[in-house]
């Protein structure tokens, strides 16, 4: 999957063909466009956070859809919430968060690396994520905090994707709304990071501390039809049987594709040989209102 900014007289070149932008402009989403070579075609699709996660330029390691969905659920995010994301990175999770909080919520996202912050801000503007919905800052939150709380307003949830999230836990507590139950999530690849983060969460009064690893395990499903059998008398089967009971034998020329279904169809599944492995540990905790 590729992302493309369409403009007048532009041309999209790929290994499957050439696609002039003028033939795309004005077409409805879902339209199938044939290449000039006439060999391959592409579909015009509306950009969604899921598609952006698959097509974005990688400036850092990103958070993928299974983790995104799980984090959004466990933080109990809703439209209208105010949320801090620390570690904007390539902006994969930022787009999903913005959709979850819209239309009247707000995402405050922070990035330590200045160039990455500038590139992410440019992408937000190109994707029509208005400043009223998403605010990005270049800031070292571990040293300087989030600059939120009190007159700046509190938030309902915090997400930390940092090398040392335990250094930002105290600052996160200051930014969380003390008048309600709030949640925090820390995304850490290594178990040693989880241990230090859990210790910092306990010291700062967080409760219900849980750690999860979100793994996707795909299964291949097959249609299986049992081989039918027919019965013969022992004498016709050319076998000796002292009690004269009927014997059972498989039909030699049975074709499961052409024969009528007799109800013996089964669906069976098995795990695929290769599965996606560890991405990160997700540590969640709650801060009870005062």
Language-model-derived ranges and their functions:
Residues 110-166, 223:
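S-adenosyl-L-methionine
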Residues 171-266, 272-276:
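C-terminal substrate-binding/active-site "lid" region of AdoMet-derived donor-dependent transferases
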Residues 55-69:
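Conserved SAM-binding loop and adjacent beta-strand
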Residues 1-46:
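N-terminal auxiliary segments of SAM/dcSAM-dependent transferases
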Residues 90-103, 173:
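Conserved SAM-binding loop of SAM-dependent methyltransferases across substrates and taxa
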Residues 81, 105, 180-182:
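Glycine-centered, small-residue-biased loops immediately flanking beta-strands
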Residues 106-111, 186:
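Conserved SAM-binding motif I beta-strand of class I
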Residues 78-89, 108:
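Conserved class I S-adenosyl-L-methionine
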């Amino acid at each position: 999957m590729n992302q493309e900014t369409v403009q007048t007289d532009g041309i999209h070149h790929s290994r499957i063909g050439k696609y002039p932008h003028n033939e795309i402009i004005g077409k409805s989403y879902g339209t199938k466009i044939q290449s000039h070579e006439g060999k391959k075609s592409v579909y015009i699709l509306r950009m969604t956070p899921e598609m952006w996660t698959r097509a974005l330029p990688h400036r850092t390691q990103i958070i993928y859809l299974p983790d995104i969905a799980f984090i959004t659920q466990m933080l109990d995010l809703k439209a209208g919430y105010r949320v801090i994301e620390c570690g904007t990175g390539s902006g994969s999770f930022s787009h999903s968060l913005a959709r979850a909080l819209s239309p009247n919520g707000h995402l405050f996202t922070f990035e330590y690396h200045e160039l990455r912050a500038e590139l992410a801000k440019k992408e937000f503007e190109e994707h029509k994520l208005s400043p009223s919905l998403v605010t990005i800052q270049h800031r070292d939150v571990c040293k300087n905090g989030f600059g939120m709380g009190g007159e700046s307003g509190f938030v309902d949830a915090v997400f930390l994707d940092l090398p040392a999230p335990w250094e930002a836990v105290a600052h996160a507590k200051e930014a969380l709304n003390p008048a309600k139950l709030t949640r925090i999530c820390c995304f850490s690849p290594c178990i040693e990071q989880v241990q230090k983060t859990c210790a910092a969460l306990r010291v700062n009064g967080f409760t219900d501390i849980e750690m999860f690893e979100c793994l996707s395990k795909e299964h291949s499903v097959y249609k299986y039809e049992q081989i039918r059998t027919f019965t013969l008398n022992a004498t016709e089967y050319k076998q000796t049987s002292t009690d004269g009971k009927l014997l059972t034998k498989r039909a030699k020329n049975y074709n499961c594709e052409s024969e009528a279904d007799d109800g013996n169809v089964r669906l069976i599944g098995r795990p695929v040989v290769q599965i996606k492995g560890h991405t990160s540990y997700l540590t969640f905790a709650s801060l009870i209102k005062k």
